[in-house]
Structure formats: C-alpha cells, structure tokens
Amino acid sequence: MALLQIAEPGQSPKPHERRLAVGIDLGTTNSLVAAVRSGVAEPLPDAQGRLILPSAVRYHAERAEVGESARAAAAEDPFNTVISVKRLMGRGLEDVKQLGEQLPYRFRQGESHMPFIETVQGLKSPVEVSADILRELRQRAETTLGGELVGAVITVPAYFDDAQRQATKDAARLAGLNVLRLLNEPTAAAVAYGLDKGAEGLVAIYDLGGGTFDISILRLTRGVFEVLATGGDTALGGDDFDHAIAGWVIEEAGLSADLDPGSQRQLLQIACAAKERLTDEASVRVAYGDWSGELSRATLDELIEPFVARSLKSCRRAVRDSGVDLEEIRSVVMVGGSTRVPRVRTAVGELFGCEPLTDIDPDQVVAIGAAIQADALAGNKRGEELLLLDVIPLSLGLETMGGLMEKVIPRNTTIPVARAQEFTTYKDGQTAMMIHVLQGERELVKDCRSLARFELRGIPPMVAGAAKIRVTFQVDADGLLGVSARELSSGVEASIQVKPSYGLTDGEIARMLKDSFDYAGDDKAARALREQQVEAQRLLEAVQSALDVDGERLLDEEERLAIAAQMDTLRELAGGSDTAAIENQIKRLSQVTDAFAARRMDATVKAALSGRRLNEIEE
C-alpha cells in the first residue's frame, strides 16, 4: 500500500532538502542577489566573480544586454541604454518629464499614463526594464545554486507607495520570479545586523542609495523587528551627488549646460568616478574634454551639503514620529553605497551622537537581510521565522460628503493590517455609493492623493442615514492595499485591489507630511466649516422633504413662513465661511421645526394604530 506524503504548508516534503530561495536588492544604481548557503547569507557572484550587477540595460534589435557592459555603453548609446530605471517605477509620464535633464530618454505615453522609453527594440516600460535586470539575477542564482528557485524576497524603499510596490511585483512576475515577500530595505538591513549581532534596542537605519533615501527607526526585541516610524525621499541619492559634481565641472570649465545625451552620460560617469575616489583621497584630478581641474573633498562636501541636510531633516522627522528621543537611539546602521561618502558618515554620526555601524558592506547588507528572510519563508528554518512589523508611510482613507478625507488607517500603522469603518447614505432612496480611496495627511480631499475609485451598487432604498455600509481597508505584508464595501442589511458587496497607474511625484510624500504639520490649524478650521456646511445641506433637504409631504396638513401659514425664513437664512450662511454662524443657524432651524417634527411623529403613530383594538396593541 502506498503512503501519502504529507508536508507542512510551505515546507519541503523531503525534510533534508533545502528549497532554493534568494534575496534581491533591486537598486537604482546597482543590484545584488544573495542566498543562505551552509548557514551563511552571502551575495552570489556571476561567472567572472563579480557580486554587484549595475542596474543598466542596453537594448539591441534582438537582445538585451544587462550589467557592466551595458553601463559602459551609456555614453555612446544613451537612447538605448537605460539606467536608474528605479526612479521611473510606478510613475506617470508627467512625473518623469520633470526628471528629463537627469534621464535623457525619448518617452512615449502608454496606457494609464504609463511612460514608455523608445529603444531600437521598441517601446519599453520601466517594469519591462526592471524585469530584464531581475531575469539576469534569477539566472545567476539558478546557475550558482544549481537548481530552480522557489521564490525571492525583493527589497523596496520603505517610502515606495502602492503603485511603486505593485510595479516591482509585476517586474518580478515578468522575470519568472515568485515573490515571497516585498521587504522594506531598512528592515532587511535590520535583519542582517540583528541576527549577526543579536542586537536589541532602538536602532536607526540610514539608507542612502543611488536614487532613493530611507530612514527608519526600529525597535529590535528577541527576533521581533518593529518599525516605529519611517521617512525619506524617493528622489534623493548618490545620483544627486554626481549631478552636483557635473554642474561644478560645467561651471569651472565654462561649458554650456545644454549637453547632448552622450556628453551628459560621459560627464556623469567622470563625476561618479571622482566621487568614489574622494572616499579615500583628499583631492582628485578631474578631466573632461580639453579641461582639467582639481576637486577636493572639502569642495565635494560643499556641493553635496544641501542633499545631506535634506536627509538629516527626514531623520529628525522620523525620530519625532517614532515618539522617542535622539539620545535613546543606541546605534545607526548605514546602508547603500552613497553612505561611503565621508561627509555623510560624519553628519549622521553628529546627529545621532554615535559612530555609525558599517561592519557589513553597505552595498550588500540589504541583499543579505533579504536572503535570510527568503530562507525562512521558503521553510528552511522551522521555528526561526522572524516577525517583521513594517509600517505604512502615509494615512489611508476615503472621501466623505463635503470633500472631506476620513482616515481609516493612520500613517505608521504596523502592517499587515485590516481596519473597518461604517458609513451611511446621504440622501433618501440612495441605491449606490461611490467609494473614493485616498492617501495623505490633510483634512480635505483636494490636498490628498487619489488612489482608486469604485462603486457599491444595489443598496436597498431607505431614508438617508438608515443604510449601514461597512468599508474595510486591508494592507498586506507587501504594503499593497485592498478595499471592500458591504451593505450590511442586504449583503451586497464590492471590492478593489488598488493598482494606481503611477506613483507619487518627487518628494511628494515628504511634502504631504510637511504640509500636514504646516497647515494643521487651517485644515481643522476648513474641516469644521465643511462639516457644518454638509450638516446644513442635510437639514435643509430633510426639512424641505417633510414640508412637501406634510407642510400643508400640519402647519398654518405663519408657521410655514417662519420655517421658510430660517431655511433661507441657513442657505445664505452655508454659502459663506462663518462656521459658528452656520452652526448657530442649524440650531435655530432645528428649534423652529421641533413642533412640526413632533406633530409628524404623532400623526405617524396615530395612523399606525388606527383601526386596531386595545388588546391587539397590548399583545
């Protein structure tokens, strides 16, 4: 008799057989793939022994060239060589046009405003370009490990919004990868350091890569990595340092800033090389065309100071959001190649009052942490899976009457999470409701970001306020949002997986947070005004409806005129901006209609009891 093989969900049916899973750091400038081998997480090399894969793709008519050779061709073939594609992930065409000087491509608009890059191989979306990089990493891993991968943990900046995360998952699917988890880059770094050091306490993760900056404040306790707060800038990184140096060269050499794409790429490569050499040297000679000059580390520090200051501002905000003091943070983990710049390390050390941790190569630490988590999720470490408590960077909510933003999940809420809230109809007989999903910190819809819209139909006709619609927001472990709405009496339901066509523009998250603090007082006043205006409109409609049905029957002319006068006054005030006056007039109209409401109730009760015996009523 054959025995049925039974295995735990996610575990191998062969207990001694390891399931091959990898961690991938899909970076703006460089990418890596790592795996746990013989109990140690380590980056996987290519055939030439190189660990780092430049995030560059050069398109030929029949094939795609990925990595070092593609990056080397950027100056001679700029239109067909795509670099820093991470900056384009989840963005719309209007957003990427703002980066035109930094990304000299020929863009075309595709469906849902998605940008496409013109190449000799045809139009390529950022998702397709990222997929080519991921495919190269997958092939490297399968060759090195000698088998097919069961999945990968792919890291993303903590500040990536829903669109950017979804774009990353789509790229992985195109590359033939099963995504076990999208992991925030700072959390991945904490995994690497937490396991290696057995660290506990409050830790800051300062992650400055080629194109993005993240700062996260974490509490590490016995294998639990809790993100207390996160911040950063989706358009700040080492690329900005390169552009600052390039600008200095143009100014010193007296060149025109309007360079052709090939010359621009060549100048940026020279700038990047100078930046890297200044990590170990006090000054370097920079040559471009017929010009050459001396660039000192002190001059570099001056050039990049505005960018360093921007990162420190985000750090202070994240510390404040976490509810802890700077002095309580006992260590700072440095992540990303741009943290090798001496001025960056010095500035971070001065802010936090401690020597930054650089034990693990900052280029490798994220991939190593992702590999450790991938190994656990693949079922190779029973009983040792880490509990990772990430957070959402901006509040999620929906639009209510009057253009108000009702927050359902506040920012810095730990994910995965599900929250529900009940809403009701605004008008009598309303049978449908538009659900408008929003992201942001402001009180008014116009100041927040629209994520998605969907409609709940089939609501039973009822008087305004009688229907109960439960709206549930669910954010999964990857930070992706789903929203459902259900009318409780009938059970009719509608839902949506939020997949916006493009993400937040440069610095928009930081701006949204800043605005929420700067305009907090104004926003509350505006919200209070809108709420009173909505209540005034609701009361006016309810009174008018009652007058149309019972006014002639239950009121004399003097009473009708008195109510009409108060209604006219409320209509006039509701069109203004005096919140207190509207509130007081609502009270006056309510008072003048109290007797009318009581008579309507008496008439309704009398009609209900008419023709029935006393014993029938008592029963």
UniProtKB/Swiss-Prot annotation:
Any Pfam family the entry gives: HSP70
Coiled coil: none
GO MF annotation list: ATP binding; ATP hydrolysis activity; ATP-dependent protein folding chaperone; unfolded protein binding
InterPro entries linked: ATPase_NBD (IPR043129), Heat_shock_70_CS (IPR018181), HscA_NBD (IPR042039), HSP70_C_sf (IPR029048), HSP70_peptide-bd_sf (IPR029047), Hsp_70_fam (IPR013126), ISC_FeS_clus_asmbl_HscA (IPR010236)
Superkingdom in the source lineage: Bacteria
Keyword Phosphoprotein: no
CDD domains: ASKHA_NBD_HSP70_HscA
Protein keywords: ATP-binding, Chaperone, Nucleotide-binding, Stress response
One of the protein's GO biological processes: iron-sulfur cluster assembly
Similarity section: Belongs to the heat shock protein 70 family.
Function: Chaperone involved in the maturation of iron-sulfur cluster-containing proteins. Has a low intrinsic ATPase activity which is markedly stimulated by HscB.
HAMAP family on file: HscA (MF_00679)
Protein name: Chaperone protein HscA homolog
Organism: Pseudomonas aeruginosa (strain LESB58)
Designated gene of the protein: hscA
